Amino acid sequence: LSSAAQYKVLHVCDGDTISINYEGKEERVRLLRVDTPESNHPDKKQNIPMGKTAAEYTEKTLAGKSVDLEFEGERKDRHGRLLAYVFVDGKNYCLELIEKGLSPYYTKYGSSKKYDQEFKEAERQARKQGLGIWGDPELTQKYLRLKSKWGQSAKGH
């Protein structure tokens, strides 16, 4: 991992979106291959306690820190956010979210080219231990349904 550029985290938007100082301006970054429950959705019904937990964890871990970005595939999404794996102190924070059960391994837009095995294993362990979303039967059902859908949409790419 090249540490050529480190970016300062200016603001944590929610569990899987942060804003950083990127080449002199504020840019939002959507963390790749993770999807934490909503905490900041305009439709309040979408916001759930586990989303708040994920957002608070990201806040505690990343706010004010310098992070590395690693891109894979497209650099921006349709909302103009950068798409990247975020590393803090050399650790893949996307992997950490999956390890802690704060996010499933999010494959709606394809699998990770580089971290597929690690992400799968982290999710398997988190599920086995009933961590985070996997400790809530309703959320588990929801994510298992979504994951089978994602599997189909990823194949259709």
PLM segments and residue spans:
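Small beta-barrel nucleic-acid-binding modules, primarily SNase/OB-fold domains
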Residues: 1-157
